[in-house]
């Protein structure tokens, strides 16, 4: 079974406004509402690819109810913990001459709520996959990812971590199955500027030395790199296409890698599927579908 954790899910309200101006009434030309959050994106793409997962995390109020409704409508199973104080956040994404975002805070998550999450994690068993993705709300301990991995260390669970800076490096001693920084985040960790794929491989191996089993590094238009636990190194150029929406591309890469690995047990195949899933989402207004991913795979095999 696959589980994803999104600590602070959102309802993303995306509006397109022609020539937006401050201080006057602006009218939208297009608007979209969808559930947001990195773990939620992973669960959504997994469902599109034919893999069931359960989305975990915390929701509150009428916004939380709508997040759950929209996910269930997409066929995504949810088991969010209801939080009594506050309301799940609404994030406004304004697209005009420039793109701007206003992100909400989210509910007040208390110790009792966190204990309920640990009780859910007790139900995980050998061979399960757990995806920890995104930031941690400031109302929760900053050590949350590390605490979860410590809590589960006696179980043979494949844990995937898609986070930045300390959230990522602090979990390395617990040997996560997969981590997915981008090239800029990788450079920030080591205080260097990453200039090419050879640099990526060099510093990805340093993360392996610190405990990561597999390191998948996205490089936007420059492609991606995988350094796997069996000593293999894989490089890929970026598939060719017109970028329409970069939101969720990294999460889609994680979902593609997980589904590819579970279906084949082969790191190269997982890497190919991850890269093409991430790109398929970037080339679409919405998150990638299985048909879009497979079509991109068929015409991109020369890139690997």
Regions found by a protein language model. Name each.
Residues 197-304:
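Conserved phosphate-binding/catalytic region of the ribokinase-like
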Residues 101-103, 128-134, 162, 180-185:
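Short beta-strands and strand-loop turn motifs
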Residues 1-56, 64-66, 304:
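Glycine-rich phosphate/adenosyl-contacting loop at the front of the ribokinase-like
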Residues 115-118, 142-149, 195-201, 235-239:
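Charged helix-capping and loop-helix junction motifs
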Residues 146-230:
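Conserved phosphate/ATP/ADP-binding segment of small-molecule kinases
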Residues 47, 153, 262:
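Gly/Ala-rich phosphate-binding loop of Rossmann-like dinucleotide-binding domains
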Residues 2, 51-54, 78-79, 159, ...:
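Hydrophobic anchor at the start of a short beta-strand
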Residues 24, 48-128, 297-304:
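Conserved N-terminal subdomain of the carbohydrate kinase-like
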């Amino acid at each position: 079974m696959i589980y994803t954790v999104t600590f602070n899910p959102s309802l993303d309200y995306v509006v397109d406004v022609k020539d937006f101006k401050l201080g006057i009434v602006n009218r939208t030309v297009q608007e979209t509402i969808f559930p947001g959050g990195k773990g939620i994106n992973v669960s959504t793409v997994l469902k599109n690819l034919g893999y069931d997962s359960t989305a975990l995390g915390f929701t509150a109020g009428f916004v939380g109810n709508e997040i759950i409704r929209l996910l269930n409508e997409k066929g995504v199973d949810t088991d969010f913990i209801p939080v009594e104080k506050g309301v799940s956040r609404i994030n406004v994404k304004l697209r005009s001459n420039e793109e701007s975002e206003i992100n909400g805070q989210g509910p007040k998550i208390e110790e009792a709520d966190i204990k309920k999450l640990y009780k859910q994690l007790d139900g995980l068993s050998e061979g399960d996959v757990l995806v920890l993705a995104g930031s941690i709300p400031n109302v929760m301990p900053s050590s949350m990812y590390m605490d979860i991995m410590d809590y589960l260390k006696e179980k043979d669970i494949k844990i995937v971590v898609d986070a930045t800076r300390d959230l990522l490096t602090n979990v390395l001693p617990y040997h996560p199955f997969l981590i997915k920084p981008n090239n800029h985040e990788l450079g920030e960790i080591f205080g260097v500027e990453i200039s090419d794929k050879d640099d990526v491989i060099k510093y990805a191996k340093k993360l392996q030395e610190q405990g990561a089993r597999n390191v998948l590094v996205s490089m936007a238009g420059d492609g991606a790199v995988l350094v796997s636990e069996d000593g293999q190194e894989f490089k890929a150029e970026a598939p060719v296409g017109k970028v329409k929406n970069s939101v969720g591309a990294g999460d889609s890469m994680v979902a593609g890698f997980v589904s590819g690995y579970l279906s084949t047990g082969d790191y190269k195949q997982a890497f190919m599927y991850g890269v093409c899933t991430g790109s398929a989402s970037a080339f679409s207004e919405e998150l990638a579908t299985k048909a879009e991913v497979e079509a991109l795979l068929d015409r991109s095999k020369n890139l690997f």
